[in-house]
Amino acid sequence: MTEAVERLTKKSEDSSRWYLELVRMAKLADYGPVRGTFAIRPYGFAIWERIQADLDARFKATGHVNAYFPLLIPESYLTKEAEHVEGFAPECAWVTVGGDDELEERLAIRPTSESIICDFYRKWIHSYRDLPVLINQWCNVLRWEMVTRPFLRTAEFLWQEGHTVHATAEEAREEALRMLNVYRDCFYEVLAIPVLTGMKSPSERFAGAVETFTCEGLMGDGRALQAATSHDLGQNFARAFDITFLDENQERVHPYQTSWGFSTRTIGALILVHGDDRGLRLPPKLAPTQAVVVPIWRGKNKGEVRREAEALHRELAEAGLRAEADLDEEHSPGWKFNEHELRGVPVRVELGPKDIEKGQAVLVRRDTGEKEFVGRGAAARRLVELMDEIQQNMLRQAEAFRDENTRRAETYEEFKEIIEEKRGFVVAPWDGTEETEQRIKEETKATIRLLPFEREEGKDLVSGRPGKTAVFARAY
């Protein structure tokens, strides 16, 4: 019997090492041969598929359709919007040779698709009757990152990017905010991550945007993570790419655009928000396996226990649960318990000879560690109920952590002390100047994560000038 167990570093002792070990040990991802590239393994990809399915349904419910656009973007396209190329050129990977021939123009491997999509929109949009255009694409992108971590910051990653076109500025802003709320709902309802939403400061806006709206999550180590963004692009790209349409007055005008994106970075957020010293803790709505039946057998009762475990597994599947039975004979029940805890399976179902004799099953929750004894015939029904209870409890736990680690600073010294010793979100007035923002970043390594939609007035802690509420944190 194989019993070798690799010990996971405790999150409470070294969260950075814990994270890297967990990604590997839970078989979520593996390193690629090119710096910053990773293979997303089947278990990690199954999580992404569930996120993708949920978001895709939300997009379609709000009138969006899917399409696909080219991976290779001519350099001349990127340079048409000045701020855009300035923001993305340093991160571009370039194709300069095709076969044996040097290309006349460099081709960027898609860092984001505004420029290439705008060229198509220029050809497709002619009249106000063509609007709005509500298109999303699921794809990979490549950004030449220098410092990488699996899921959190990688050179190549998977994402969706929505690109919409509207007749008026009001419609575009409404769309950008609507999609921000779609993201927020997905975080709360599916990932059980209580994100804050608001606006980015001008220096943190997407390159070429009029306004950037953001979902910011607080990770378990007290650092923030930009989890998803939605951009009001105004007419900047429409002007740069000469997208025009005839309005209802038969005047040729530029439309207004939005773009918004959500990536595999959220799997990193899922790990950091919910994971603990024993490994992953997955919300039931995302867990590839919601319940695992672990038979506990010894010698002569092995056949009976195995049959009962298989029967219970079938019942759980028929009840609509994503379930599996761990019938592996190479490892002990204790080893299996640790393995499924590491993988974050929401509920472990233990079934031994005594349980069969008593007509019961033992349910062990991953979120709390609590054990519950239920009648064998009621196990499937109770597990269905537990999925919702666990989902809600994990959100409550994450909300409690976020709230406990959100503090107001009354002086700059207090601000620096919180950032250095406690981390988390710090709420303080900001005078709106890039000078103050940059000084805070240099002295504390904290950045403005967002500007709340409802901002209170106060005195800037650094400059003493009048300011309005901003939320600061150190971030990934």
Curated annotation (Swiss-Prot):
Enzyme Commission number(s) from the entry: 6.1.1.15
> What SUPFAM superfamilies does this protein's entry cite?
C-terminal domain of ProRS, Class II aaRS ABD-related, Class II aaRS and biotin synthetases
What are the GO MF terms of this UniProt record?
ATP binding; proline-tRNA ligase activity
- Catalyzed reaction equations: tRNA(Pro) + L-proline + ATP = L-prolyl-tRNA(Pro) + AMP + diphosphate
One Gene Ontology cellular component annotation?
cytoplasm
Q: Where in the cell is it found?
A: Cytoplasm
Keywords attached to this entry = Aminoacyl-tRNA synthetase, ATP-binding, Cytoplasm, Ligase, Nucleotide-binding, Protein biosynthesis
Q: What is its main location?
A: cytoplasm
Pfam families, alphabetized: HGTP_anticodon, ProRS-C_1, tRNA-synt_2b
Q: Which InterPro entries match?
A: aa-tRNA-synt_IIb, aa-tRNA-synth_II, aa-tRNA-synth_II/BPL/LPL, Anticodon-bd, Anticodon-bd_dom_sf, Pro-tRNA-ligase_IIa, Pro-tRNA-ligase_IIa_arc-type, Pro-tRNA_ligase_II_C
Name one process (GO BP) from the record: prolyl-tRNA aminoacylation
| HAMAP family noted in UniProt | Pro_tRNA_synth_type3
Q: What is known of its domains?
A: Consists of three domains: the N-terminal catalytic domain, the anticodon-binding domain and the C-terminal extension.
For this chain, the family text in UniProt reads:
Belongs to the class-II aminoacyl-tRNA synthetase family. ProS type 3 subfamily.
Job of this protein: Catalyzes the attachment of proline to tRNA(Pro) in a two-step reaction: proline is first activated by ATP to form Pro-AMP and then transferred to the acceptor end of tRNA(Pro).
Subunit info?
Homodimer.
In Swiss-Prot or TrEMBL terms, this protein is called Proline--tRNA ligase
Q: Which organism is it from?
A: Rubrobacter xylanophilus (strain DSM 9941 / JCM 11954 / NBRC 16129 / PRD-1)
Its gene name is proS
